[in-house]
Amino acid sequence: MSRRQSRKSAMQLIYEMNMNGDYDKQRIEEFCKYQNINKNDIEFFKEIVLNFIEHIDDIVNIIENNTKQWNLDRINKLDLSILQVGVCEILYVESTPDSVAINEAVELAKEYSTEKSYSFINGILGSVLKRKENASL
């Protein structure tokens, strides 16, 4: 599994968690068995999802603070999951350069979401990065 595939799998599991309201770490192992994810390629996937679960409140607050005039309930659930993966990588996954995290989130949006979503996601993650660089998160 490539890092891109790991992100895709993380997005899928986070989407499921958001839809079910179940953020239990046990879901990771169940998802891996169901998806038949290779043990050698699972570390990056787990790093994203575990950081998401650990920091979910902060990630949600950061997204809310960077979506001007948007209530999170108005954001497509898939787009929200992509944003959560992107914010998680920018803030908590040190092995991923910030620009790569943003680009990969945009690519996920282009592949799996609506035509307008990728620019929306790019804008929000760009704002998150600017605040991080200015240390105002």
Swiss-Prot record:
It comes from Finegoldia magna (strain ATCC 29328 / DSM 20472 / WAL 2508) (Peptostreptococcus magnus). Belongs to the NusB family. Keywords: RNA-binding, Transcription, Transcription antitermination, Transcription regulation. Pfam families: NusB. GO terms for molecular function: RNA binding. The keyword GTP-binding does not apply. GO terms for biological process: DNA-templated transcription termination; transcription antitermination. Involved in transcription antitermination. Required for transcription of ribosomal RNA (rRNA) genes. Binds specifically to the boxA antiterminator sequence of the ribosomal RNA (rrn) operons. GO terms for cellular component: cytosol. It comes from the Bacteria. This is Transcription antitermination protein NusB.
